[in-house]
């Protein structure tokens, strides 16, 4: 059946800021307490969506979550009217207010793991929201994520949206940032590839400096609940040394699409065995794996982390060629820029490189791949997505005007204490639900 990969990008929320909340994420820590520009951040992401849609790629939009999260702050013991809750948190525990105000749901690669209907046991598209239990500011996202996905992908004949896995370290799940899929064609059965940082119940290497956020047990549980064919499911461990170098998700060191794996030579433990397994498994499904392995001598792990070369989107054009979507930081790193020039000039599957300014997101450790959730849909499934979330000229104009109207152009950490920020955000989100036609999505609307 004809199918296409759609990318659903997260709209950056009005409270986008740099609070340095993500230990293990080098960019997040390096830019802690800098002033952010939410308006620029949202428009940078929106422009990427529009340009990719103009190039013929299926591009959807996911709305921000409500922030600050008054639910979290009240759960943590702050009481009173909304303004009082914010004031008390700002005075007594500003770090908790920062966690409650994070716009991190913009990185929808962590929203969920998605398996297309061609791979699942019941022939439906399956979504498992990620519990993101390693970080407080992200662990509060999964309920709203499930509500959003259930709203957009509402038809039970086509879609199954699960609850997140139990939020315990043994089942730490970071979503599609540690998952990719290989196939001959999007609509045919493929090979699902899960990458984990550690195993809770199996002895093996682990990072020493930064935490491994994804467990083998979580990856296996997602595969099982999606009803995947065990013979078409491959698990791999990310090299703990690269986690300690700042590769907190696999999509910072590797990206795959169709029959191509673009990866750094230090990405995986026992890499050759992984390549061999993927090759054999994909061969049984009618495709030959192309591994583009970037050597350390050309691009170091540090270069990869600072430029986010691998936190890129690898997209298939109608003619079968592929394009790599990278942040502009890749052009500012001499080693990475030289490698990309050589890559595009070669005879491999990647024939073109598109560069985007995503500076605001990048300063928090999120490149093009972080901002999107891949969802393979056949024609009937796409038709079942009835909300106004597909990017086109009209939606772009509406969202651009909405951002211009509602977003601040400067937000420093101290500004999170401003109670009017909550009112501004709710006003903006209320209007957004009308633009996207998603109904009463937020708690404050219910």
From Swiss-Prot:
Any one Pfam family match given in the protein's UniProt record, by short name: AstB
Domain of life: Bacteria
Pathway: Amino-acid degradation; L-arginine degradation via AST pathway; L-glutamate and succinate from L-arginine: step 2/5
GO BP, sorted A to Z: arginine catabolic process to glutamate; arginine catabolic process to succinate
Keyword set, alphabetical order: Arginine metabolism, Hydrolase
EC identifiers of the protein: 3.5.3.23
Known partners and oligomeric status: Homodimer.
Protein name as annotated: N-succinylarginine dihydrolase
Gene: astB
């Amino acid at each position: 059946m004809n199918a296409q990969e759609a990318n659903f990008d997260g709209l950056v929320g009005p409270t986008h800021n740099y609070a340095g909340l993500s230990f293990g994420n080098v960019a997040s820590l390096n830019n802690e307490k800098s002033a952010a520009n939410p308006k620029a951040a949202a428009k940078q992401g929106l422009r990427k969506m529009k340009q990719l849609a103009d190039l013929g790629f299926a591009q959807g939009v996911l709305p921000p979550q409500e922030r600050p999260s008054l639910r979290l702050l009240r759960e943590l013991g702050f009481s009173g009217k909304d303004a009082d809750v914010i004031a008390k948190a700002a005075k007594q525990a500003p770090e908790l207010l920062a966690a409650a105000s994070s716009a991190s749901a913009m990185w929808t690669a962590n929203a969920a793991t998605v398996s297309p209907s061609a791979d699942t046991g019941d022939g439906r598209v399956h979504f498992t929201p990620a519990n993101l239990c390693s970080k407080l500011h992200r662990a509060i996202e999964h309920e709203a994520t499930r509500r959003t996905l259930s709203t957009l992908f509402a038809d039970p004949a086509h879609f199954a949206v699960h609850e997140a896995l139990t939020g315990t370290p043994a089942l730490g799940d970071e979503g599609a940032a540690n998952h990719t899929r290989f196939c001959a064609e999007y609509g045919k059965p493929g090979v699902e590839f899960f990458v984990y940082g550690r195993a809770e119940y199996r002895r093996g290497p682990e990072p020493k400096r930064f935490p491994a956020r994804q467990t083998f047990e979580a990856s296996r549980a997602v595969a099982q609940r999606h009803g995947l064919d065990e013979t078409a499911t491959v698990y791999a461990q990310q090299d703990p040394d690269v986690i300690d170098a700042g590769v907190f998700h696999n999509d910072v060191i590797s990206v795959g699409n169709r029959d191509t794996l673009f990866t750094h030579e230090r990405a995986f433990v026992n890499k050759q065995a992984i390549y061999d397994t993927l090759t054999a498994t994909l061969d049984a499904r009618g495709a030959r794996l192309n591994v583009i392995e970037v050597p350390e001598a050309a691009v170091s792990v540090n270069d990869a982390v600072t430029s986010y070369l691998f936190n890129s989107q690898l997209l298939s054009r109608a003619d079968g060629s592929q394009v790599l979507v990278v942040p502009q930081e890749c052009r500012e790193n001499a080693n990475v820029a030289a490698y990309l020039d050589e890559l595009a000039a070669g005879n491999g599957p990647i024939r073109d490189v598109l560069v985007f300014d995503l500076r605001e997101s990048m300063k928090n450790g999120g490149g093009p791949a972080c901002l999107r959730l891949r969802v393979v849909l056949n024609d009937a499934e796409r038709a079942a997505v009835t909300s106004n979330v597909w990017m086109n000229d009209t939606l772009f104009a509406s969202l651009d005007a909405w951002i211009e109207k509602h977003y601040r152009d400067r937000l420093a950490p101290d500004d999170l204490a401003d109670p009017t920020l909550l009112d501004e955000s709710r006003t903006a989100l209320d209007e957004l639900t009308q633009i996207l036609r998603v109904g009463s999505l937020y708690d404050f609307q219910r």
